[in-house]
UniProtKB/Swiss-Prot annotation:
Descriptive protein name: L-fucose mutarotase
Any one of the GO BP annotations: L-fucose metabolic process
Family: Belongs to the RbsD / FucU family. FucU mutarotase subfamily.
UniProt: substrate binding residues: D30, R109, Y131, G132, N133
HAMAP family, sorted: L_fucose_rotase
Gene from which this protein is expressed: fucU
Reaction(s) this enzyme catalyzes, per UniProt: alpha-L-fucose = beta-L-fucose
């Protein structure tokens, strides 16, 4: 155990966060996401919500400022609806940790799957919120 590291951040996830370079993306997926079909680098965070992971990741993670939207979520499939409270809770969690909210974009389901294939890794969570998947893009960590 390390001081200052949120308990939702496993050693495997901490290693991935450290390995990621600027421009790399991390998928935080819900419990139903086809992660193993889409990607070879999968970390399990069973029973842990995406909000809890965002609480732990955000203080360690610089969001990309060179892209229009460093946050990406899946848009609802035609004829379906999504709960805007899911997005709002994620954005509030990020804002609480870093003081601002990066821009978020949405893409259709299959475009999201294709984007996930290109990510650095996928984290399967215990999240059950419909359309709860989110991709976060890492930026350049400032030197202090």
């Amino acid at each position: 155990m390390l001081k200052g590291i949120h308990p939702a951040i496993s050693p495997d996830l901490l290693k991935i966060l450290a390995e990621m370079g600027h421009g790399d993306e991390l998928v935080l997926s819900d419990a139903h996401f086809p992660a193993h079909q889409l990607h070879h680098k999968v970390v399990r965070a069973d029973g842990i919500s995406i909000n809890s992971l965002l609480t732990g990741i955000t203080p360690l993670f610089e969001f990309d400022t060179y892209t229009e939207a460093p946050l990406i979520m899946m848009q609802a499939v035609e004829g379906d609806s999504l709960d805007p409270a899911v997005e709002q809770s994620y954005l509030q969690t990020i804002k609480s940790a870093v003081g601002n909210v990066p821009k978020l974009a949405r893409m259709d389901r299959f475009a999201f799957y294709e984007r996930a294939k290109q990510a650095y890794a996928v984290v399967i969570t215990g999240e059950t919120a419909k359309y709860g998947n989110i991709i976060i893009k890492k930026g350049v960590t400032p030197v202090k």
